[in-house]
Amino acid sequence: MRRWSLLPLLVVALVGAACTQSDLTFDGDGAVQPGPDAPAGETLEDPDEVVEVALEDLRSYWASTMPEVYDTAFEPLRGGYVPYGPDSPLPACGDEPLTYDIVAENALYCPAEDLIAWDRVNLLPDLQQRFGSLTVGLVMAHEFAHAVQSRALVRGATVTLELQADCFAGAWVDDVDERIATFSTDGDALDQAGAGLLELRDSLGVPGSSSSAHGSGFDRVSAFQEGFEDGPEACATYAAEPPPVVAIPFGSANDAATGGNLPIDQLLDPLVADLESFFAALFGELGETWDPVDRVEAFDPGGGPVTCGGDEVPEDELEMAAFYCVADDTAYIDGVGLLPELEAIGDFAFGGELARLYAIAAQEQLGIDASDDRGAGLHADCLTGVFAAAEFLQEIPEQRLFLSPGDLDEIIIAFLAFGGEDGATAFERTAAFRAGFVEGAAPCEDLLG
C-alpha cells in the first residue's frame, strides 16, 4: 500500500523578511572582499552571506573547471558583482539604463558590462526563506554559468543557453556538496532546489523559440539533474547538441482558459483508455499479454470499510492512500484527501498517480520482485515517465488525451508535494520519471533493488 503525506515545500505562505543594509563590498575586477567566514560544518542562513560564500566558491570552481571543459582560463568578471534593491543604485548594462521595475525580483548576467547583479531585497530573502540556502547558491551558479558562456563564446537559442546554465549549476552543486555545509544536498535540500527551479520556470504556453524562454519546470529540473549526475562536460555538449525542450502549446482558447486542466470526472475515462492501450502495446513489445485492470475506484477513508481480497484495510492506513489491490485487480485512491490535493496541482498530477498504479499492476503481471519498496517505487515512476512520453509524442494506439502546457511540471510538483513511505526523495523520483520519459523503458529495470 502507498500512503502519501502532504509536505510543506510548495504550500509555504509568503512572509516578508526584514532586510538590512548590505555589509558586502565588491571590487570592479570581480573580487569579493573578505567577509564573515562560516566555521567548518556550520550552515549560513543570511542570504547576503550565502551569496558571498557561493560566489567565492564559484570563482574557485570555474578557475579549475573551465580549462578542463573549454581549454581556456577563466578571467575574473570585469564588472564584478552588484547587489541591488528598490532604493539602491542600479548597475549600467549596455546602452539601456536599468530601472528597478525591469529587474525587480531577478538576478542577471550583463554581457556588455561583464557583471552579475541580483535583487538582494525582494528575490534572495524570499528564495532563502521558502527554498533554503542551496537554492540561493543555485541562482548565483546559474548566472555565473552565463559568464562562463560569454568567455567560451557559446552561442545558441536563448532556451538552450538558459538550460545549459541550469546544467552547469547542477554540476557545481554536486561538486560543492561535501565542501561547504551551507550547500549540502543532504535531506530535502535537493527537493527544495527543485521546487525553486519550478518557481522560476516559464509561464505556461511560452514557446521554446521565444527570445525570453528559460524552459518549463520539467526542462529546467532535467537540465539541473543532468549536470548534477554527469558533470560539466555533459553540459558543454548543449551548444552542439541542444537538449530537447518540451514546450507544449495550448490547443485552443478554452485550453488556455482552463490552464490545460480537465475536471477529474472528464479526465478519468480517456485516461484509463490511454493507459490500457499503452500497457497493452508495451506488453506486446515484451512478448507478453496485458490483462486490463478491472477497476479504478475512489474511496472515502471515513465512509465505511475498504476491502482488498476480502480483507478490510485498516482505516488509519487509508487516509491519503493510493494503492493497487492485486486480489481485486483494482486501483484505489483516497477521493476525499488525496484526490482533491492532486486536482489542485493539475489534472496530470492525478494522471501520473494513476499511471503509477497501473505500473504497479504491470510489475505484478510481469512477476517483478517488488519486495524492495524503494526500488519498485522508482521503477513505477520510470514507467510513468515512459507513459507520459508516449502521450507527448502521440504514440498511443487510438490515443484520446493530449498533453497541455504544465502537465509534466504537475508530475514533478506532485513528487515535491507528497512524501511516500519508501524513502525515495522527490529528486530521485523525478530522475526516475525523466529517465523513462527520455530513454524509454530500458533504464527502468536498473532501478529495481
Show which residues each predicted segment covers:
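Pan-zinc metallopeptidase signature
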Residues: 205-286, 420-449
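Bacterial signal peptide processing site
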Residues: 20-23
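Short helix/loop segments within enzyme catalytic domains
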Residues: 53, 65-67, 160, 166-203, ...
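C-terminal motif of bacterial Sec signal peptides marking the signal peptidase cleavage site
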Residues: 14-18
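Short pre-active-site segment immediately N-terminal to the catalytic Zn-binding motif
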Residues: 121-138, 153-159, 335-352, 368-374
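Catalytic zinc-binding patch centered on the HExxH motif and its immediate surroundings
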Residues: 85-117, 298-332
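Catalytic Zn2+-binding segment of zinc metalloproteases
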Residues: 144-159, 171-178, 358-372, 389-392
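Acidic helix-start/capping segments at beta-turn-to-alpha-helix junctions
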Residues: 40, 69-95, 164, 184-198, ...
